[in-house]
UniProtKB/Swiss-Prot annotation:
Keywords: Cyanelle, Plastid. The keyword Plastid applies. This is Uncharacterized 24.3 kDa protein in psbH-rpl11 intergenic region. It is found in: Plastid, Cyanelle. One of its GO terms (cellular component) is cyanelle.
Length: 182
């Protein structure tokens, strides 16, 4: 006997694939139509869908292939999520949190030094007022009491509010970072 023709081999392969696709589509149609497929035994279900034992064998092969392929895909996706995606996202979030924490620390230090400079300036102005007070006490008394002392206390209040706000931001960032690590 001679070798089978390439055209016949392609035709045979096409018929086998077409048969498997029909079986798969019929299976999906039965499942989608919500008939009581799984109440009946699986063999009877296969008999409803297909006619010959060859088709049952083809269907079982097809189901086995899809099962193995889906197990492999799920395994690969699990590996990707555990060892690639999670460390990358954790690294990105750690980097972002470190930048945010360092920016908050820089802002805290900047406001602290601005407060010190303003406090020194206001104390210096207060000392100048005390010096001028000796000569022009009636004029400058109300300026010192109402303006500079209240301004110093106002700046202290702003600094205290900011420091508590900054601590709240740091606590929130630490909490968020611990939630992401879980």
């Amino acid at each position: 006997m001679g070798k089978p023709n390439l055209k016949d081999q392609i035709k045979q392969l096409y018929l086998v694939l077409l048969e498997e696709i029909k079986i798969f589509i019929l299976t999906i149609k039965l499942v989608i139509s919500k008939k009581n497929v799984w109440i009946i035994s699986y063999y009877h279900f296969l008999k409803k869908v297909v006619v010959s034992k060859k088709q049952i064998l083809n269907l079982s092969r097809l189901l086995l292939r899809f099962t193995l392929l889906s197990i492999f895909i799920l395994f690969v996706l699990d590996l990707i999520s555990k060892y690639i995606t999670a460390p990358i996202l954790t690294g990105i979030f750690n980097f972002i949190f470190k930048i945010l924490i360092s920016l908050v620390n820089l802002l805290y230090k900047a406001i602290y030094w601005i407060y010190i400079i303003f406090a020194i300036f206001l104390h210096f102005m207060n000392y100048l007022l005390v010096l001028l007070e000796l000569t022009l006490q009636p004029i400058f008394e109300w300026i010192e009491i109402f303006f500079f002392n209240s301004l110093i206390y106002f700046l202290k209040l702003i600094f205290l509010l900011y420091s508590n706000f900054e601590k709240g931001i740091l606590i929130f960032l630490m909490w968020l970072k611990s939630r992401i690590k879980k």
